Design a protein with these regions (language model features):
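Hydrophobic adenine-recognition pocket in adenosine-nucleotide-binding enzymes
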Residues: 7, 84-86, 119
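Residue-level recognition of the GNAT/N-acetyltransferase active site
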Residues: 69, 87, 91, 120
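Conserved acetyl-CoA-binding loop-helix of GNAT-fold acetyltransferases
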Residues: 86, 92-105, 131-132
Length: 148
């Protein structure tokens, strides 16, 4: 059975360990100490978003994070699916689909107007999951401007 627990301060070390595994997939750099501080800030301030541990048969197998944004185009608060990670042994078992359904229900409870996300070009399994869950490709390009 798949269940979800709201992330707590006591979960930060486990979350960062999973985040390191997630980032390693695509070779993204990660500063574990900085990530721990960011998780602490995030968990303490519910206005920033929500994070959940994903459990399968009471074993933690991943996490999902929604970050909140106010958006005029969509009429209010929306969320970015900032991260959705499942351990390798949890993939392909329907847990991702259940997790998307869970965050859709949570989004309704939170009166969110829209969910959006990014997915790697090469991650066809994730793209298939998101498309089958009702997400569509957006006809705009994503750009960024990073501040140090």
């Amino acid at each position: 059975m798949t269940t979800y627990n709201a992330a707590a301060l006591s979960d930060i070390d486990m979350l960062v360990k999973m985040m390191q595994e997630f980032y390693a997939i695509d070779g993204y750099p990660i500063d574990a100490e900085k990530s721990k501080k960011l998780f602490e800030q995030f968990i303490k301030d519910e206005n920033l978003g929500k994070a959940w541990l994903i459990l399968s048969d009471e074993k933690t197998v991943g996490y999902v994070i929604l970050t909140f944004v106010f958006n005029f185009e969509y009429g209010g608060k929306i969320a970015f699916v900032d991260e959705l990670y499942l351990s390798e042994d949890a993939r392909g078992k329907g847990i991702g689909t259940k997790t998307i359904e869970f965050i859709k229900k949570e989004s309704e409870k939170l009166s969110l107007k829209l969910l959006y996300l990014e997915v790697e070009d090469h991650n066809s399994a994730a793209q298939k999951l998101y498309l089958s869950s009702g997400f569509v490709f957006h006809n705009r390009l994503t750009m960024k401007l990073k501040f140090e």
